[in-house]
From Swiss-Prot:
NCBIfam families hit by this protein: PRK01018.1
Protein name as catalogued: Large ribosomal subunit protein eL30
Origin superkingdom: Eukaryota
GO cellular component, one term: ribonucleoprotein complex
């Protein structure tokens, strides 16, 4: 069971890295909310230790704009590392998937 979960995380991380190279994205709650309000977001990724108020606000705007949400199994440090950044991030909004098939 743990092996399956780990391979699933590796798959998501690989897709995220492909988005970082070939697609367009914004990091952070405020920027993600802006893209959601403008209707430019294709997918939103939320870390599992995102504060509940932020999580609820992002999920609310996702339902309004009919944008899919992916709940990342790692914490915000893991999400930042998967994005290739040296800092933590709770929310990632993908505006252009590029060569990745992460939105499917």
């Amino acid at each position: 069971m743990a092996k399956k979960t780990k391979s699933k995380v590796n798959t998501i991380n690989a897709k995220l890295q492909l988005v970082m190279k070939s697609g367009k994205y914004v990091l952070g709650t405020q920027q993600a909310l802006t893209t959601l309000r403008q209707g430019r977001s294709k997918l939103v990724v939320i870390a599992n230790n995102c504060p509940p108020i932020r999580r609820a606000e992002v999920e609310y705007y996702c339902t309004l704009s009919k944008t899919p949400i992916h709940h990342y199994s790692g914490n915000n440090l893991d999400l930042g590392t998967a994005c290739g950044k040296p800092f933590r991030t709770c929310v990632l909004s993908v505006t252009n998937v590029g060569d990745s098939d992460i939105a499917t």
